[in-house]
Amino acid sequence: MTRNSIRFLLFLIPFCAALSTRALPQEIANDEELQAQLAAGKKFLGQTADRGAVLFFLAATYAQLKEPHEAVTTLKECVALKEGFDPAGDPAFAGLRQSKDFQTLTEQVHRDFPPISTAQPAFLSSEKGLIPEGLAYDAAQDVFYLSSLHLKKIVAISRLGEFADFVSADRYKLLPVLGIRVDAYDDSVWSASWLDNGRTELLHFDNRGKLLGRFSLPEDGRKHGFNDLVVLRAGDVFVTDTADNHVYRFEAKAQAFHEIKLARALLAPNGIALSDDESAVYVADQLGVLRVDLKSGQSAEVNPGPHCTLAGADGLYWHAEKLIAVQNGIGSPRIAVFQLSGDGLHVTKTTVVEYRSKFTVLPTTGALAGDDFYFIVNSQIDNLNGDRVLDNTKLQPVRIAKLRIP
């Protein structure tokens, strides 16, 4: 996940980071923590393919430090790149909203990037307290799976829009459930779970919801947080660890985790995608997307090119040489489709398919069903602190929408 301001100390308040750069109105960071975050962010300048993403992160940190001049100055540089960052949609900038300079910047962004809507309603839950994070599709059974952070369960959704528990809340005493994917080989279901005290598990269920295994990293004294994952045909799983800024490969036969070495340090890794031929895995973090060659083990950052950003992708998916991203870490959320070059290392075309519409309330992830992309419209993760609902009166039925991939 990713939202409620990029900050929340992606280094120091892991669950908040996981739940996205705009996710939770949780604990207020002190100046010492924010200064540490600022220093860490500055180290990424010149080290990534997307300068705008680093600038947006720094501007938000300055805003939280109540340094309006530095925040606006940094935002001006970011907005001038015309990549799509929209500070109006990020709570970190709440203290600047009465500033004329800030208003001028957001007006410019909205002129450059007008609202777009191509989606239509798909499903609506009757249950209000789900607060979902992950969505997956099982083509063999023609069923969707929705993970619940608050109720700590997994729900199955039929094509008719019928919701039923796949793994009930009290069955296995699960942690909050995040990313979820289906193993196409045997229709089993894998999911990531994570509580903000640093407890995290990789879960494996059969296609009837029976728990086949739950796996944790060896104790190392650090806080970890599994977030999203992909499943290879051989049964191995790649999973992002948002809290500790790493990616792991879980070897299913040996039941062992192996850390993946990447070309640069990560900042809250989140969404992850697997190419159809399983030649590459794409890892999203707050600053962009890295491609990992599964044969050589080498990695490199995907270059978005000018006037484009791959940053802040909570959900990331591969479809016909394209990446589909649910970007809720760039201010106002959007869903975008990125056509890639033959080597998978450059964006050749960007198509924003949903932005500043009634379907981008607070999206987190989605799932592909053929050429249609289904996604969570209103996750409500901003009403959750850890596994506690902040205001029960604000809970709403979960809306899921769909759109056709261009």
Which residues does each PLM region occupy?
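Asp-box/WD-like beta-propeller blade repeats and closely related beta-sheet repeat scaffolds
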Residues: 111, 115-120, 199-236, 240
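Short loop/turn segments that connect beta-strands within beta-propeller blades
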Residues: 158-162, 206-210, 251-255, 293-298, ...
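Beta-strand-rich domains and repeat architectures in extracellular enzymes and scaffolds
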Residues: 114-117, 121-155, 396
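Beta-rich, blade/repeat-based domains predominating
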Residues: 126-141, 149, 171-194, 218-237, ...
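Short loop/turn segments immediately following the C-termini of beta-strands
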Residues: 149, 194-196, 242-244, 284-286, ...
